[in-house]
Design a protein with these regions (language model features):
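Helix-loop boundary and gating motifs at the non-cytosolic
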Residues: 20, 31-48, 52
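Intrinsic disorder in cytosolic terminal tails and internal cytosolic loops
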Residues: 2, 200-246
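A membrane-interface helix-boundary motif in multi-pass transporters
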Residues: 172-190
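Structural signature of the two symmetry-related core transmembrane helices
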Residues: 81-96, 187
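C-terminal ends and interior cores of transmembrane alpha-helices
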Residues: 89-109
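Helix-to-loop junctions at the C-terminal end of transmembrane segments
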Residues: 66-78, 174-175
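Loop-to-transmembrane helix entry/capping segments in MFS-fold secondary transporters
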Residues: 49, 143-155
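Intracellular juxtamembrane helix-capping segments at the cytosolic ends
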Residues: 129-143
Length: 246
């Protein structure tokens, strides 16, 4: 039993789903900055080692839990709408997190309460972390099933290209704005994805692809891992039976 997998160039992938490639690139920028500079941000905000550990734990667990409800919603409604809602939700919570970070604008009793920071950071992570799986499922809506693996590999490559610039760009934001430049950066790039999604909805109709559905995927998955997607069914091919004398 073998799986039939057809190749797909990056140009073909872009023509099939411009929004998928665009959002994959900039989500790579977001994710690399988020996971590399979160501890730097927390240290600059005078978090203790325990508090930094709590923040990184909340980031991971929120993203894992969010996969299930977000995936279910995306299989019912237009995935572009779900991506747009998630990105703008993450952008809004990123800005709110600035206000409860202890640096700005709120009364001391509220601003310095890390409980508020944790709460809004959880909501931010809940909106942001399922994004790659959503992007992959959205892209699959516009291609045939035999190209799912090739499309996933192309999106992973595009994600990696974006990831190379994330820490550098985010550090510029933090250098110009201060520690909270970290969340300003996250606000800007999430909003950029959401804005492009709105534009794409105006120029292209939604399609129904019964072969495409949300499957939770990590950002670091390889093309070989994408082949394990349970929706990619094997195709039976005849195996020649050769009798050989020994």
């Amino acid at each position: 039993t073998f799986k039939k997998i057809n190749a797909m160039s990056l140009n073909e992938l872009y023509k099939s789903s411009p929004f998928g490639m665009f959002s994959s690139f900039f989500y790579g920028t977001i994710q690399s900055a988020l996971f590399t500079l979160l501890a730097v941000y927390a240290t600059s905000m005078n978090f203790t080692i325990l508090e930094i550990s709590i923040v990184t734990f909340l980031l991971a667990i929120s993203g894992a839990v969010a996969q299930f409800p977000v995936g279910k919603i995306s299989d019912v409604y237009d995935r572009r709408k779900v991506i747009i809602a998630s990105t703008f939700g993450a952008a809004i919570f990123a800005i709110i997190t600035i206000f409860v970070s202890g640096q700005m604008y709120l009364p001391d009793g509220l601003a310095t309460s890390k409980t508020w920071f944790y709460m809004f950071f959880i909501l931010f992570s809940f909106c942001s972390l399922p994004m790659f799986s959503l992007i992959l499922a959205h892209t699959n809506d516009y291609i045939t099933k035999d190209k799912f693996v090739a499309a996933g590999a192309g999106l992973q490559f595009t994600f990696g290209l974006g990831a190379m610039s994330g820490p550098f760009l985010c550090s510029i934001f933090m250098d110009l704005v201060g520690s909270n430049g970290f969340f300003v950066f996250l606000f800007f790039f999430h909003s950029l994805i959401g804005a492009f999604g709105i534009y794409r909805m105006r120029v292209r109709e939604t399609v129904e692809n019964p072969d495409s559905q949300f499957v939770a995927m990590p950002q670091t998955i390889t093309p070989a891992g994408i082949e394990l997607n349970p929706t990619t069914e094997p195709i039976e091919e005849p195996i020649k039976d050769e009798n050989r004398e020994i």
